[in-house]
Amino acid sequence: MGQYVLLNGIVLTARDKVHKYLFSKRPDAGAMPFSLEGGVIYHCGPIIRQSPEGARVIAAGPTTSARMQMYEPFIIEHYNVRGIMGKGGMSGAVANAMKESGCVYFHAIGGAGALLAQRIKKVSGVWLLEEFGPAEAMWAFEVEDFPAVVTIDSQGNSMHRQIEDLSRQRLEEILISG
């Protein structure tokens, strides 16, 4: 926990609508163009520019992960996901699912969507574009040296929870001594 990492390989975007779809429809691996098994899901609604040469990512900053946490334990366990990336952390229930499945949470840099887009070398494909539109579709990105920090480790330890606990403790100390 707290390790700075550079991700390389395929990252799949998924926001609210894709999470709800995966949870409610439960498509099997054969029904999806991408495999989630062993993969990384990025909570991101990218800005994509289409051209005759293909899709190019203009911005790809993280979105708040808490909105997806009601679906995430199921998705981690059912699809055997090994990494979730976003911003803001996730609940204790998600951290427990991560512990059970050997998954981690990567915190990406909020407010740096254009900078992060430079680490996306190729758009490999898209799923559910017609149904959900470009921001909510699932995109497959080939990333190179994509920066993030591990803030929930595969043992379920959460840096977010530790900071909350420490902040609460310090606030109590200030209020009592004040």
Protein language model regions, located:
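Active-site/ligand-binding-proximal alpha/beta "capping" segment
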Residues: E72-P73, V150-G178
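Structured core elements
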Residues: L6, I41, V149-T151
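Structural motif
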Residues: Q3-Y4, G9-I10
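Feature captures the catalytic cores and cofactor-binding loops of soluble hydro-lyases/lyases
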Residues: T13-F146
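Pocket-edge structural micro-motifs
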Residues: G9, C44-P46, I152
